[in-house]
A protein has these predicted regions:
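Conserved ABC transporter NBD signature motif
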Residues: 66-76, 84
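Helix-to-loop junction immediately C-terminal to a conserved catalytic motif
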Residues: 58
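The feature captures the beta-strand-to-loop junction immediately N-terminal to the Walker
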Residues: 43-45
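Catalytic Walker B motif of ABC-type/P-loop ATPase nucleotide-binding domains
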Residues: 167-170
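Conserved ABC ATPase signature
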Residues: 142-146, 150
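Conserved ABC ATPase "signature" region
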Residues: 120-138
Length: 287
């Protein structure tokens, strides 16, 4: 689905004088492969390069060196960009910068009109997109009247309506409250599980990545670590090296283990930890 090979992306950091201006590598020879239908998380501290990488997935940025292939089409070739941007949709941190319609329905239809989708098909896609994000009752609402979570769900509906194979959520939950974050992540998981859409989640919230098929850890423009949540979260010191923390429930499980409770690690979900504690209390679980 997506293959990144030896990707380098630099930007100019301007100083007070021309002599002080330097070139900074935001991405430094990145290699990555993402298969169709996977739920991928890309994590890292601020400035690690994760959002810069995300913008290469649908040709918003172009490689200085290396290649990004989307379904075997290179983002470096202008003729491929239209198809690539139909294949990979993006949702960004601030939905106000992405919503342009006077109503929710009008906003979702914008991309479909640009694709010249017939009216009957367009209406069907809008209906299915609204249903997928649980916003059917807000069809005629003014986006300005919506909550932050509802605006982000509207942006997701618009991105999904064009029938992409891949959806990139670039810090899409960063401005949301915990409840809205859970709703957005839940929708992403459903799109992945029920529709087979490849999800690429860019985030710094560790509790959002526990169900990912694979996690890539970015640090100073390189892929520093990669693996499943179980592989990466078994070692708290690994994430600490990159200024990241374990998910709260995983940290709690480690703390209980250190205090002598025979908790089996790593723990990903509160329900899982509660179940283990109940079994320990009943004497059904020991070290």
């Amino acid at each position: 689905m997506i293959k990144v090979s030896n990707l380098v992306h630099s930007y100019l950091k301007f100083g007070k004088t021309e002599e002080d201006t330097i070139s900074v590598k935001a991405l430094d020879h990145v290699d990555m492969e993402i298969d169709k239908g996977e739920f991928i998380a890309i994590i890292g501290h601020n400035g690690s390069g994760k959002s810069t990488l995300a913008k290469h997935f649908n040709g918003l940025l172009f490689p200085d060196e290396g290649t990004v292939w989307i379904d075997e089409l290179s983002t470096g070739e202008q003729k491929n960009l239209k198809q690539i941007r139909r294949t990979v949709s993006m949702v960004f941190q601030n939905p106000d910068n992405q919503i342009i319609g006077a109503t929710v329905e009008e906003d979702i239809s914008f991309g479909l009109e640009n694709m010249q989708i017939p009216r009957e098909q367009m209406q069907d896609r809008i209906d299915r997109s609204l249903e997928a994000v649980r916003m059917t009752d807000k069809r005629q609402a003014n986006p300005g009247s919506l909550s932050g979570g509802q605006k982000q769900k509207t942006a997701i509906a618009g991105a999904v309506a064009v029938s992409p194979k891949c959806l990139v959520l670039d810090e899409a939950t960063a401005m949301l409250d915990p409840r809205a974050r859970r709703e957005v992540i839940g929708i992403a998981r459903e799109l992945n599980e029920k529709q087979g859409i490849t999800i690429i989640l860019i985030t710094h919230f560790m509790d959002e990545v526990t169900h990912a098929d694979k996690i890539f850890v970015m640090d100073h423009g390189v892929v520093a670590e990669s693996g499943t949540p179980e592989e990466l979260f078994i070692d708290p010191q690994l994430l600490e090296r990159y200024h990241l923390e374990l998910p709260p429930v995983t940290r709690l499980a480690f703390s209980l283990r250190q205090k002598g409770l025979p908790v089996r690690l790593p723990v990903m979900e509160p329900e899982e930890l509660a179940d283990q504690i109940e079994r320990i209390y009943r004497g059904e679980q020991r070290c």
